[in-house]
Amino acid sequence: MTDMPSALHHLVESVTDTYAVVAEHPRPGDIRPSVWEVNGPGGERWFGKVHAGPMLHRREVTAYQNWTVALGPGSAPELVSADTQTRTVLVTAVPGRSLDTLRLPAEQERVAYEQAGELLARFHTAAADEPMPEATEESWDEEVARLMDRTAGHAPEHDVAMVRMLAKEAPPRLPQVSQHGDYMPKNWMWDETEQRLRVIDFERAELRSAAYRDMSRLRYRILCHRPDLDAAFHHGYGRPLTEEEQSACQAYAALDALDSLDWGIKHRDIGLVDEAQTMLENLRRETGRSVWGGWRA
């Protein structure tokens, strides 16, 4: 274990003079800061981290201050302290283990996904009254062009052509919600004793359509090839995706797949590369494209 950053020591010391750093939890890739586990004097268990940038810090603090309450009592960590200048946060721990590290019996796994759908439905209502500027087709076209220039060299030509085709038109304009931004099993804590799911890591939470990341990532990384979990998740969410949402998910997923592939290769995040490949494979199957032929570093 390396030394916890001094900025995090200062943040914890703003809460208590007596504490113990018990573990460092590295995150995938070569630029994401570690998460630090800290024990307080009264048996408290906290996690602290230094955000990689001010936007991530602002998003996570906003989510804890305004949105996570919609999940219900005990369904997410609580913000203990934060410092904007040092981009540090300290949050309470929640019971359970990350779902992506567990191998649950099929019925338990379906229950977990149903609860994940229910919690996401609640979270998507948290900012119902907050305004959000609508994206324009011009900004979408610019985003697509920038991404293609930056990432096309890492994917086979047939995948690049597929992404161009899927992103040719801007996604349907959908209602904005408070999205989690990385709503995947790695951020779902499953307590086997309680048979209860909780949600962590809100640094990518922002006002976007539900299809932008929350639905598109889950759909094309997992649910496309797990119809049982797809049914359980949407039962918990309360409804299936509309045709417009499905269309938007496809367009967003196409760009996200290339972006994730590029980021994973550049930052040695093999898990993210694998997830990007899965997204491309599922998009190919959905659009009738040819079998994946490999990626280029």
PLM features: what roles do these ranges have?
Residues 32-40, 166-215:
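Active-site acidic catalytic loop and adjacent metal/ATP-binding pocket
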